[in-house]
Amino acid sequence: KSFPMHKFRSMKVNAPDIRLKDGSTYNGDDDPRVTKLGRFIRKTSLDEIPQILNVLKGDMSLIGPRPDPLDWLDKYKEEEKVFLNVRPGITGYNQAYYRNSADAQEKIDNDVYYAKNISFALDVKIILKTIKTVLYRENVNVTRE
């Protein structure tokens, strides 16, 4: 399902889309597209707060795989698409355990794992790990080639 995802702006207007070799978004600490305030709200995950509106509207949940742009749907193998049946979340397995350190394929694999093992207990673990990850700013800016 397509929906507009709310976020605080953290990049300069008309910033170019910079991708790594694996197709994932560049999130380096030296990213020239990110504003000074943007660096702060990203490191503290405050840029995600507006997505609570998406949760209230029913487009997202608190926990689930992060939503991807629609033009990415054709890059998934058929057996990977299982995670697309799960409502996307503000935080998820990848954000809690890897934040920005997992490459594109690892993120897909982790989203598939979550979709196949979804449970209240796993969601509680993800929430607790997300809190720890945000408080200790783990894996915020990881440069991968």
Language-model segments: residues:
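Conserved small/aromatic sequence motifs within transmembrane helices
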Residues: 1-145
